[in-house]
């Protein structure tokens, strides 16, 4: 553990601890050169556990993966310092509170607000999925989404994100968060559609206040709140289809429906069918009178 007041690399002064995991501690630090606050993740290279090397390598992989990314909804990594014993990862300090804390404090959130958050998350996930190779986040849930004071959001905790490798048939046997992770995440290959499933469960949780980890059987959102729109219910139901081929196939497709939920309701589909019947009748009559 780094003592408060320690200056790392001649410029990052440790102010206070703001979080910790199994082999890492996160501090708030002040860059004395730029007069700017950063979050500094301290990673000890050796501990007492037999899986320490695996954990350290995972944390380093997370840092190196994030360092090459640049998106407003993702935290930036600006420096990685290795003194031989400890690795320090310097990243954006994100003010605000996680969406799970918002749920705990205020309960289920308004549909309009949840859609706005989901649109931002779709854009961030689409950015990750568009990398070469694609990056699969694999742990979307309210606890991993920070709501900033100005209302925008950032995705945090890339500890189990990975670069997609098509030839690797199994990669996620014990990773992910139960209730949010799709079936394939526990038995085989994950891809962009796995993140879409977790985003659907995240939207469901935000709209209903029902934590999917509680063991409650899945029920469409309007069974919990009939005031929600049919459009958002259909969108979420499609996101969380057990079979990946039945879900949205990309976040861009999902984003389009989130921006136009009225287009997928039953009323819209009925109107389209009526238009098609009318068109077919018109064409048939035209042929008759030729």
What are these regions (language model features)?
Residues 25:
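Conserved N-lobe ATP-binding subsite of Hanks-type protein kinase domains
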Residues 123-135:
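Protein kinase catalytic-loop region centered on the HRD/HxD motif
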Residues 80:
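Activation-segment/catalytic-loop signature of the eukaryotic protein kinase fold
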Residues 177-263:
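C-terminal lobe helix-coil module of Hanks-type protein kinase domains
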Residues 47-68:
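AlphaC helix of the eukaryotic protein kinase fold
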Residues 117-118:
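Activation segment signature within eukaryotic-like protein kinase domains
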């Amino acid at each position: 553990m780094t003592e408060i007041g320690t200056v790392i690399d001649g410029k990052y002064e440790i102010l206070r601890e703001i979080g910790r995991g199994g082999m890492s501690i996160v501090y708030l630090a002040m860059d004395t050169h730029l007069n700017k606050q950063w979050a500094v993740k301290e990673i000890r290279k050796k501990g007492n556990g037999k899986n320490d090397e695996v954990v350290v390598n995972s944390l380093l992989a997370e840092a190196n993966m994030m360092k090459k990314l640049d998106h407003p909804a993702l935290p930036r990594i600006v420096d990685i310092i290795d003194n031989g014993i400890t690795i320090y990862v310097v990243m954006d300090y994100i003010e605000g509170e996680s969406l799970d804390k918002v749920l705990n404090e205020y309960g289920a959130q308004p549909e309009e607000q949840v859609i706005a958050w989901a649109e931002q998350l779709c854009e961030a996930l689409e950015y990750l999925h568009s990398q070469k190779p694609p990056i699969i986040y694999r742990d979307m849930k309210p606890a991993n989404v920070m709501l900033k004071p100005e209302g925008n959001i950032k995705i945090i905790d890339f500890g189990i994100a990975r670069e997609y490798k098509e030839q690797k048939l199994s990669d996620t046997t014990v990773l992910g968060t139960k209730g949010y992770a799709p079936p394939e995440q526990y038995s085989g290959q994950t891809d962009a559609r796995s993140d879409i499933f977790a985003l659907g469960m995240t939207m469901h949780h935000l709209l209903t206040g029902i934590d999917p980890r509680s063991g409650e059987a899945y029920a469409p959102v309007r069974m919990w709140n009939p005031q929600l729109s049919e459009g958002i219910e259909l969108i979420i139901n499609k996101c969380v289809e057990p079979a990946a081929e039945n879900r949205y196939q990309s976040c861009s497709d999902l984003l389009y429906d989130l921006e136009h939920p009225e287009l997928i309701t039953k009323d819209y589909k009925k109107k389209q069918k009526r238009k098609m019947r009318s068109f077919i009748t018109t064409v048939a009559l035209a042929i008759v009178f030729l």
